[in-house]
Amino acid sequence: MASVQASRRQWCYLCDLPKMPWAMVWDFSEAVCRGCVNFEGADRIELLIDAARQLKRSHVLPEGRSPGPPALKHPATKDLAAAAAQGPQLPPPQAQPQPSGTGGGVSGQDRYDRATSSGRLPLPSPALEYTLGSRLANGLGREEAVAEGARRALLGSMPGLMPPGLLAAAVSGLGSRGLTLAPGLSPARPLFGSDFEKEKQQRNADCLAELNEAMRGRAEEWHGRPKAVREQLLALSACAPFNVRFKKDHGLVGRVFAFDATARPPGYEFELKLFTEYPCGSGNVYAGVLAVARQMFHDALREPGKALASSGFKYLEYERRHGSGEWRQLGELLTDGVRSFREPAPAEALPQQYPEPAPAALCGPPPRAPSRNLAPTPRRRKASPEPEGEAAGKMTTEEQQQRHWVAPGGPYSAETPGVPSPIAALKNVAEALGHSPKDPGGGGGPVRAGGASPAASSTAQPPTQHRLVARNGEAEVSPTAGAEAVSGGGSGTGATPGAPLCCTLCRERLEDTHFVQCPSVPGHKFCFPCSREFIKAQGPAGEVYCPSGDKCPLVGSSVPWAFMQGEIATILAGDIKVKKERDP
C-alpha cells in the first residue's frame, strides 16, 4: 500500500518533497506544492522557479544531484540524462548491503567521499528510486553537505536570505539595480523593497505631473479643446469627488477627484483620463482606471497569480450618491463613447458631488476585515502622519489643496477658500507635535483635534509609548471646519481654533496626544479613564463599540466600528495614570 501511495506522489519543484496530487498546483511553469505557494506568495512563484532552475543547473546537479522522478518535466533532469548518455560509461558500482530505507550506520558523507574518490557519482535508475537505502524519499542522495547547500541556495532566493552576488549569478537578467520584473508580473507588485519604492516614487511623480496639467486645464476650463471635450470634462468635474470601490472586495475604496483629456491613439482625437486617490486619504494618486484597478486587484488577493484581462472598468463600482449605498459599475457611467468624447455621459448615471467642506469625510476608513491581510498595502485605519520615507511619493501642498476642488461659483466655493486636504492637515499636526494647546505659541496653529496624534493602531508602536489608541480613520479637522467639529462634538469651549479638547463623557480637558477618537463622529473624543471604564463595563466577551454608547457606523457603510484587541489592551494598560501627562 505504501508503494502505491508513493508512486502517486509528485515532486514539488521548489522544496523537492513528494506531495500527493491534491496538494500540487499546476498553474505555473513547474509543478509546485500548495505549501510553497502559500509561503512565498503566488506573485513570486515564477521568479523563484526561475531562480531554482538556474541553481539546479549551475550549482546542484554537477555535484551529484538526482534527476528526480520521471513524472515531472524538469529541464535540469533532461540535461543531466543527455549528458549521462553521451559521456563515458562508468564502471558499475560495487553493491554494498544496506538496510532498506535507512542507509545503515554509514553516514552520507562517507558514501559521498567513496563515490567521488572512485571517480563516479551516484546516478541510480528510476526503478531504484524508492528502494535504494542510500537515497531519500525525494530521490536525492544522502549527501548532507550538498543537500544542505542546495536547500540554503533555494531558500536564499527570498529577500534578505541570499547574498546579492549569488542571486545575480543565479537569476538571468539581474543587473546592478536589482531584480527586473519577471514575465507575467505586474509592475505594481512589490519584488524588493528598494526597487519597489523607487518604482512607486517614479510612478507617483509621473502621476502628479499629469495631475498638475489636469488642474491647470481645469482652472482654464480646458481652453483650446473642442467644445464636446470641454463640456464633457466640465460636467464630470462638477461631480467630483466621488467614491469608487473594487467590485470583488468592498473594503478597497478610493475616490475619483479629477478628470482630463489626453491624446488618443489613431482613431480618436482625445481620451478621457481620471485621477483616483487610493486608499482614501493616503495621497497615492493613480492616473487612469487600469492602474488603480490593478492595484485593487492585487490587494484583494482573490485570484493570486492572475492579471486583469480588461481595461479595469468592469472591476470598479462608483457611488452615485454619498452614503446612499447605491453603487453602480463604473463602465455604465464611463462608456466607450463617453471615454472617447463621442457622446455625453448619461445624466441619470452622473454621481452627485459630496457637499462637505472637509474632504476627509468623503472616504471613511475601510472595514476591519481587509485591514489585516496585507502588510505592503497601506490599508490601515488611521490618520497619523507617516514620515518614514513616504513623503517623496505624496502630493505637494499646492496639489493637495487642489485635489478637493469645486467648480468656481459653486455653492461651497465661498465657504472653503483655503480648506487643506487631510494630508496637509496631518503634516501641520506632525510639525506641531510636542506643543500643547495650552502653550502660548499654539493658539494660532491648526486645531489638533480629530485625533491628530501619532496614535494609530496598537500594532504600530509598543504600548509603553502610549501614543497609539485613537482609531481615527479620517477625523482630521481643518482650521475652517474646527468650530463646527468641536461644537458638534460637544466640547463646549467655544468655536475658536485654539479651543481645548474635552472628553465627551466627563467633560475634562484632554491632552492633545492622549485620547481616543471615534473614526465616524469627529466630535466623539474620550479620555483614557472613561474609555477604560467603558471597556471594563462591556465585559471580556463581544465587540466593544464607541464609548459614547452608540454603534457609530463607518462612513459609507452600515457596519459599526469596534475596538481591536491590541487597542483594548493599550487602553487598559495600568501605567497610564493621568489624562494630562506629557511625553518626555
Swiss-Prot record:
Residues 503-550 are annotated as: Cys-rich. The modification Omega-N-methylarginine is found at R177. The modification Phosphoserine is found at S66, S125, S186, S371, S384, S421, S436, S453, S457. It catalyses: S-ubiquitinyl-[E2 ubiquitin-conjugating enzyme]-L-cysteine + [acceptor protein]-L-lysine = [E2 ubiquitin-conjugating enzyme]-L-cysteine + N(6)-ubiquitinyl-[acceptor protein]-L-lysine. It comes from the Eukaryota. Keywords: Coiled coil, Isopeptide bond, Metal-binding, Methylation, Nucleus, Phosphoprotein, Repressor, Transcription, Transcription regulation, Transferase, Ubl conjugation, Ubl conjugation pathway, Zinc, Zinc-finger. GO terms for biological process: negative regulation of transcription by RNA polymerase II; protein polyubiquitination; regulation of transcription by RNA polymerase II. It is found in: Nucleus. Residues 354-369 have a biased composition (Pro residues). Residues 60-127, 346-420, 433-495 are annotated as: Disordered. Transmembrane segments: none annotated. Its EC number is 2.3.2.27. There is a cross-link at K227, K438 (Glycyl lysine isopeptide (Lys-Gly) (interchain with G-Cter in SUMO2)). The keyword Transferase applies. Residues 449-463 have a biased composition (Low complexity). GO terms for cellular component: nucleoplasm; nucleus. A zinc finger (RING-type) spans 503-550. Residues 197-217 form a coiled coil. InterPro entries: I2BP1/2_C3HC4-RING_sf, Interferon_reg_fac2-bd1_2_Znf. GO terms for molecular function: transcription corepressor activity; ubiquitin protein ligase activity; zinc ion binding. PANTHER family: INTERFERON REGULATORY FACTOR 2-BINDING PROTEIN 1 (PTHR10816:SF17), MYELIN TRANSCRIPTION FACTOR 1-RELATED (PTHR10816). Acts as a transcriptional corepressor in a IRF2-dependent manner; this repression is not mediated by histone deacetylase activities. May act as an E3 ligase towards JDP2, enhancing its polyubiquitination. Represses ATF2-dependent transcriptional activation. Belongs to the IRF2BP family. This is Interferon regulatory factor 2-binding protein 1. The lineage of its organism: Eukaryota, Metazoa, Chordata, Craniata, Vertebrata. The gene is IRF2BP1.
